[in-house]
């Protein structure tokens, strides 16, 4: 067995699934009706670009779908892909929102990244796209 094959065989199932993941959407079953979808992802992790320490956050996504809806397993795997990513709180929230907007083109979307306090500092980053419609 070559060293490349040995390395590939050491890749854990979850790591492989995360690496292969993509944001998948499906057709909105009720595109004529304004409604909101709320998704909470309580286990977001990334790495601080300054200290290298892990950062933990709860992501709260609220959106009004257009013609497409985000598939839940796909968003879970996408969010898990940030685990070893060195990125600031602000860039993480903005990049995630941008990627979700490209994937599903919502009428309106808001992402709140509520980071666990570290060093007595609690950070919440809230970003949005589009105009919220009455439901």
From Swiss-Prot:
Major localisation: cytoplasm
Annotated residues for binding of substrate: 70-72, 89-90
GO molecular function, one term: preQ1 synthase activity
Keyword annotations of the record: Cytoplasm, NADP, Oxidoreductase, Queuosine biosynthesis
Family annotation (Gene3D superfamilies): 3.30.1130.10
Catalytic activity: 7-aminomethyl-7-carbaguanine + 2 NADP(+) = 7-cyano-7-deazaguanine + 2 NADPH + 3 H(+)
Statement: the UniProt record of this protein carries the keyword Cytoplasm: yes
Annotated Gene Ontology cellular component terms: cytoplasm
Positions of the catalytic residues: 48, 55
Annotated coiled-coil segments of the chain: none
Segments passing through the bilayer: none
GO biological process: queuosine biosynthetic process; tRNA modification
SUPFAM superfamilies (UniProt xref): Tetrahydrobiopterin biosynthesis enzymes-like (SSF55620)
Enzyme class: oxidoreductase
This protein's pathway: tRNA modification; tRNA-queuosine biosynthesis
Location in the cell: Cytoplasm
Domain of life where this protein originates: Bacteria
Similarity remark: Belongs to the GTP cyclohydrolase I family. QueF type 1 subfamily.
PANTHER family named among the record's database cross-references: NADPH-DEPENDENT 7-CYANO-7-DEAZAGUANINE REDUCTASE
Protein name as it appears in the record: NADPH-dependent 7-cyano-7-deazaguanine reductase
Provenance organism: Prochlorococcus marinus (strain MIT 9313)
Gene name as annotated: queF
